[in-house]
């Protein structure tokens, strides 16, 4: 992240993010949110653009409240506080993909669900349909494919149901984002 921060040209990064969003929309996809691009969007030089693009495109910027590892933590927490003050939806916590072998996947997620703190937790999942991805990222393909199969089989839904955890989904959070902010044109 230090290298990204040193070489970041905020205007160029914002233009690239706009191009990616525009290309996604032009392809007919319906994105719901803007992730933090492996925390790059949390850098102080890009954070305001991340939120602004969320406003402009009606996409919820994923900036969980309890993150302690954000680069530029003061700027990050100020941005989250501003979203809170404006009544915008902010996730409380974040948990992510478990890069584990098949036999550890269900028990791992059972432990994650059992330990969820109170509030809204964003699950950053990286499930991938088995196929060509193995040729792109061989080291990641196995656990991404396993996560896809496990999620498609209802594994996470069953654990959440059993634990009384309500699943919301980013489409619902996007709707809250769009209705809680300034009118878009």
Where are these regions (language model features)?
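Terminal accessory/targeting
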Residues: 3-29, 33, 45-185
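Active-site pocket-lining segments that scaffold enzyme catalytic pockets across diverse folds
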Residues: 38-43
